Amino acid sequence: MSNNNFKDDFEKNRQSIDPKEHQENTQDSVNDSVDNIKEEVSDKSDEQFPPRNAQRRQRRRDTATNQREDEQSNQEHHNENNEVGDRDNGLQHEDNSSRDSNADKESNDPSQNNNLIHESSNNQQSENRHDINNEKDQSDKDSNNKKGAVIASSGAAGVGAYAASKHNDAASSSKDHNDKAHQQNQDWEQSNQTNDSTETQDENTNNHDSKKKGAAVAGGAAAAGAGAYAAGKHKGKKDKNDNEPEQNESKSDVKNEEKHGSKKKGAAVAGGAAAAGTGAAAASHSKSSTGNGGNGNGGNGGNGNNGDNNHDSEDNNKKKGGLLGKLLPIIAAILILAAIGIFGGMALTGNNDDKGSDDDKKVADNKDKDSDKAKDADSDKDSKSDKDKDKAKDDDNNQATTDSDSSDSSDNANSDSDQGNNDSQDQANSDQNQGTQDEQNSQNNQDQQSDQSQQNGQANSNQNGSSDQSQNASNDSNQQNNQSSNSNSGQRTHVVNGQNLYRIAIQYYGEGTPENVEKIREANNIQGNDIHNGQRLVIPQ
């Protein structure tokens, strides 16, 4: 950091690009296929300087932070290996760690990276090989990460088989690195160096592989065919790597491409899976994990720094692979739970909507029933009011008829009394006149002859006969009046007030039958229903 304070902006910006950072940036924007990603990485691996402007400054910051973290992690891991190793070789391990730290500082220092004069040809070759191996391993890991994300998002069916095949591939790749490290350690043994660090490294690898195996077994469900296919495929790949050692970097590149193809096949087969092949995948992975101590590929001779760099990159890759192996089942479980929660919520809300619609229908039906009841009540009230009006009219008509009957009876009584009074007065007058005439005749005709008396007697008899006749006539008239009054009292009358014969018959007879209507017609000489308001009708008994 102190050296950067004395550099100008141009020298500060002349920093090399970390290939891992390149790999992550390019894979975020490219999603077509793994082959295209590898081609772009290989094309951009030769670039030494970032583009200018804002992207350059941002990449410079990210690169500086990533280099600092890598340096710390490599230093810590190397210190652990130094503590585990034998105390007899402690000085040599310290020398190796110092050389590794010097190599890391030289690679991290931008001035040292750009000043190619101070680097030896062996260091250049080892660092170039280290960068290429890191690029390919990182590309394989990122492609596997993308495949894992796609399969995990599609459901829990292919998670287990993919995790098993992925960790088998990680185990086979780590086995290749371990074989290289073992070969280099054998070269160091020829130069009076022990392989205690290699044995501890193998133990760490076995422990780490067992952890990954547990994560793969806990990862959930996969198909039986997919697990068996992945097991056979990677077992054959392990045997091939054990029996056919590779001698140069071109063959290792071909091996990585084939390995990547096998990963694609394993992921594709595991995509349509169910929950039966977890055991087979775990068994195949356990076989591949126990085979780490076999005959490894013979790498280039190189120097000690190359072996240490490969060793550090292996450990970093193993750590990242272990984290991914633990995270994949967790992500798949979260996705499954989220899908179950979504469908459950949809089902519950659907049921609630149905219940709400049923409640609305019930409320609407109740409202309709209430409205019908209200209408019925209104109609009942109207009918009652009509009946009350009819009763009031009938009562008025009955009262009118009773009034008319009473008036008729009073008129008849008055007429009878008047006639009786007249008759009595006439009879009294006639008797008085007769008496006076008799007295006059007796007084005036006392001296007349008997003839006159006879004539007077005849006249008196005639007068008496006429008076008797008048009295009989008056008696007959009285009898007729009595009969008429009796007939009037036996028959009823009705004054028409906006009614028809049917209503009148119902009022007086209780039934509107045609016989009752015909009685009223005959009594009043009516043809049809020809009546008018105010007409007085006789209602027979």
From Swiss-Prot:
Record key words, sorted: Cell membrane, Membrane, Transmembrane, Transmembrane helix
Domain LysM: 491-539
Superkingdom of the source species: Bacteria
Bias (Polar residues) ranges: 109-126, 183-198
Cited InterPro entries: LysM_dom, LysM_dom_sf
UniProt feature, compositional bias: Basic and acidic residues: 1-25, 35-49, 61-108, 127-145, 166-182, 239-260, 309-318, 352-396
GO cellular component: plasma membrane
Low complexity: compositionally biased ranges: 146-165, 215-231, 267-290, 398-491
Keyword Amino-acid biosynthesis: no
Pfam families named among the record's database cross-references: LysM (PF01476)
Intracellular or extracellular location(s): Cell membrane
Transmembrane intervals: 327-347
Topology with respect to the bilayer: Single-pass membrane protein
Region ranges (Disordered): 1-322, 346-493
Keyword Cell membrane: yes
Ranges of biased composition (kind: Gly residues): 291-305
NCBIfam families cross-referenced by the UniProt entry: elast_bind_EbpS (NF033598)
Name this protein carries in UniProt: Probable elastin-binding protein EbpS
Organism: Staphylococcus saprophyticus subsp. saprophyticus (strain ATCC 15305 / DSM 20229 / NCIMB 8711 / NCTC 7292 / S-41)
Upper classification of the organism: Bacteria, Bacillati, Bacillota, Bacilli, Bacillales
Encoding gene, per UniProt annotation: ebpS
